[in-house]
């Protein structure tokens, strides 16, 4: 399978593993990777993956999982290889995958966070700043409402790329590597819908994918969120923040509404936790009935596709994955977008 001399191959693998670990441990190396090396990697890999009309990352992951499972059976039963040799080969393959993942994208987990990159100070929640944020948010959400019944992929791509280019310097995010990034539809959309995932970043080939079942109102913000991951953003909260900033700055009404609508669940979740029942009820009543109806329909739509058993397993695995990559809050990281929005709002008032 691998024709290099084993000792040379093992030396190369060992050297790359050490490089990955050093970059994770030394902040200066992580900065060099995220600011200088990764943009070049993403340019090359996203160009390559863009040559294919399907998600090659999804196919690669599927074939890798299948190979890791099937190879030991084949090697043991047909080739009569000893278990030790079989498992060592499987283990070596997984280590190469580990190295590829981190060198191609995963080392961005070790970069500076949003506050460090932008020098925008973190602002802690207070009853005053949270209430101010929520009042302004609901006002803008209601104003932005427009029925979204179709998906204009060209417009969404053009607007998202244009605004990311505008925000890049001020908000600490890379510019898109290409003017026409090619989004892919997830290969296994029915299964992905069963676990409630709407999009993903394919790290091995720097391609971002969207669930084929996405509804029109969700599509623009999800596109901007997953593109943020392609731009090196690993935090889910930060990706939500950038998607919000990009979409709400668009002149296209459907895209702008999608941006505001994308964080509604996170805002209400924080409000329910921080406000009294009476305050929360008043806040909820301020939201336009059409938006509440849309949110309920969205929830019912995804609930009908969701599998509690499969979804629970995926949630557990993804939570471990995030925590293992310096996202200490795990899946709760998504809702931390509200803290980023409040900090940004307070910073803008002083600048």
Spans of features found by a protein language model:
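Post-HExxH zinc-binding segment in Zn-dependent metallohydrolases
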Residues: 130-138, 234-277
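Active-site recognition of the HExxH zinc-binding catalytic motif
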Residues: 53, 219-245
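Pan-zinc metallopeptidase signature
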Residues: 291-351
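Transmembrane alpha-helices and immediately adjacent membrane-cytoplasm interface residues
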Residues: 69-73, 80-116
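Membrane-embedded alpha-helical segments of integral membrane proteins
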Residues: 14-74
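N-terminal membrane topogenic signal
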Residues: 1-11
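Alpha-helical transmembrane signal-anchor/signal-peptide segments
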Residues: 30-35, 106-129
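Auxiliary, metal-adjacent structural segments of Zn-dependent hydrolase domains
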Residues: 147-208, 212, 216
